[in-house]
Curated annotation (Swiss-Prot):
GO terms for biological process: translation. GO terms for molecular function: structural constituent of ribosome. Keywords: Ribonucleoprotein, Ribosomal protein. Residues 9-20 have a biased composition (Basic residues). This is Large ribosomal subunit protein bL32. It holds the Pfam family Ribosomal_L32p. Residues 1-23 are annotated as: Disordered.
């Protein structure tokens, strides 16, 4: 079974983890409905790129 030859120090571990970052979600203003929505997603009212693509209740 493979075993690490040396103990990984906390500094080495933290330097490796510096690239694990959270990014803020991309939110855009939907001119059709007047609401904010995520980019490349259907709005809550069923519109995508200005067209009705889903029926909502």
């Amino acid at each position: 079974m493979a075993v690490p030859a040396r103990h990984t120090s906390s500094a080495k571990k933290n330097r490796r983890r510096t690239h694990y970052k959270l990014t803020a979600p991309t939110v855009t203003f939907d001119e059709t409905t007047g609401d904010y929505r995520h980019s490349h997603r259907v709005s809550l009212k069923g519109y995508y790129k200005g067209r009705k693509v889903r029926d909502t209740k």
